[in-house]
UniProtKB/Swiss-Prot annotation:
This is Guanine nucleotide exchange factor MSS4. The gene is RABIF. Keywords: Acetylation, Guanine-nucleotide releasing factor, Metal-binding, Protein transport, Transport, Zinc. It comes from the Eukaryota. GO terms for cellular component: cytosol; membrane. Zn(2+) binds at residues 23, 26, 94, 97. Residues 9-123 form the MSS4 domain. It holds the Pfam family Mss4.
Amino acid sequence: MEPAEQPSELVSAEGRNRKAVLCQRCGSRVLQPGTALFSRRQLFLPSMRKKPALSDGSNPDGDLLQEHWLVEDMFIFENVGFTKDVGNIKFLVCADCEIGPIGWHCLDDKNSFYVALERVSHE
């Protein structure tokens, strides 16, 4: 895996993503440039794996991540899927290869979708 780029290289003066956001595994485009806001929020994401293994919610292994792209409308995504509900959370996965979670969505907040910078690549 390539080293993560510094947020300053990825974030525009307006706080938006300068580059396209891609799946690390298959390269599928998740977000177009300029469509998400940089956000620092501490969120726990389970370890990366295929979608069926994510929806059972039984494995607590994962990472506490702080740097995310915040998307306020699910229709802004180019290529993202959602797991079944795990409590009041849906995890975001790549719609092509189904690896994830690359992000997180709380069902209590209809307008906040977080994509972890460490779980995606940029071009």
